[in-house]
Amino acid sequence: MDIGVDLIWGDDSESEVFAQAQSKDLSLIFRYSLNLKLPQSLSSRVVNCYYNLSPKDASETFSDRAAMREALYSSVCRVWDQCAMHPSISAPDVTVEIYEDAERQDQWRISHESLYKQYVESLLPISSLFQSGEAKLQAYYTVDYSSLVQIGHLGGRGRTAVVRCSSGSGSLHVFKGVDFGTFLESRADFEHRKDVCYHEIRTISSLPRHPNIIHPADVFATVQKIEDDRQAFVCGTLYPFMEHGTLDDQVKNTKTTGARLALRNKAIWCFQMASAIAHTHFTAHTFHMDIKPANFVLDSNQNLILIDWEQSGAPLYTLAPEANGSWDVKEAKVESSSSDGADSAVSKLVYERYAGHYRENLAWGRPKWNVYPFWSEFYPRALVAAEVFSLGRTMWMLLQQVAQSEVEDLDEVVVYWSEDARDIPDDWKAVVDRCLDPDPNKRIGLMDLLNFWEKVKCKDWTNSMCNPDFSGRSLSLRVAA
């Protein structure tokens, strides 16, 4: 019996823990509730350990999270066969509560959650999702969320998981959205994640097409009301699964092999990153905000595709320092002398540290004060400079081969070029350093950056000493029990 438990979460009350498990074509949500009358029961011990509560006795919790997960997994395996035969087990509003009776024997019961109705009613039908704005609905079809077989979760906000359709060809897709489990976890968090999900769908649909930017989804995952299934409500989208993973996956693969990624590939990928961001600013007239190696996936031809258009947070390890919410910007005219001696006025970005009351417009992400929308409308030059910095950090991580896990928890990222990067040409290092200049006015322009990489990628690599072949490996999907 192959049962996977790859997602465990709590709720706002800190009195319940949920676990999503799957086997073959069946995916179930299990519930563990705190029972004050049976503090040593499995469910109470799971809750106490998950929330790091302080019970009266050590027998009312587990020694650590690993022991808790093992006990939880074992309990799911013990009741799975019985649960799977229940006639209502596949209903979308069902959860399975696992508990112990007075004799400490495993018991389970099916619950049809009344909250499921609230979950569905909080979602939008496709027609309402595209009622206004620049987003345009292309040809599409829908898939019932309950028909999706969970293969493994990919992390990130909301629910992002590798799935396949139970009635389809078996091909893998990536589901990105908000499922019922998200609603059970936190109502407030769900509302935010739902808004972000819909914002991303609309944003991608409004972008002019570009070969290195993800195309609008043409498959929507939907749910229906239990009592009336005539109308479908959007809970997410399906995108093709990219088996080569992300740019960060390619770098992480080299950590085990000790190999250097081919220079030609690095040049092409740097060009494609710059091209996608230039299109974002100068053609689509918007921004990305979350530029990092993990948000560039590789398609079947090893070309980069920019994903994650939530525009609701930025990673601190690629975020431009002036865009961290502590600075305001304005443009000022300054005198400049040309080569012929004539004076002229040029525009310069002037930054001033904010000294007012605490401000916050990004409650669920970081930085807490998001300057991107305001700068996009009133100071686009400052926004472009900030995203050039993020591109520079991302390019450095690729060229130096630094995995995100090496920098994502650091208070400060120090850019360096080690002996391992001796294969990187000096002019490549120099252009990255120009992206990272502390003064945004001195950073290389985005179009100049694009032109640099276009020339590099078009060079004759025939006599190059580097291996010109694709050296990354396919993504190995890891599902934690």
Regions found by a protein language model. Give the residues of each.
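A conserved short helix/loop substructure at the end of the activation segment
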Residues: 436-449
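Activation segment signature within eukaryotic-like protein kinase domains
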Residues: 269-270
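Juxta-kinase regulatory segment immediately upstream of eukaryotic protein kinase catalytic domains
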Residues: 2-5, 36-156
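Catalytic-loop of the protein kinase fold
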Residues: 280-299
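Conserved C-terminal C-lobe helix
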Residues: 423-437
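C-lobe/activation-segment region of protein kinase-like
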Residues: 303-305, 310-419
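ATP-binding glycine-rich loop module of kinase domains
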Residues: 146-207, 211-214
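Conserved structural core of kinase catalytic domains
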Residues: 215-264
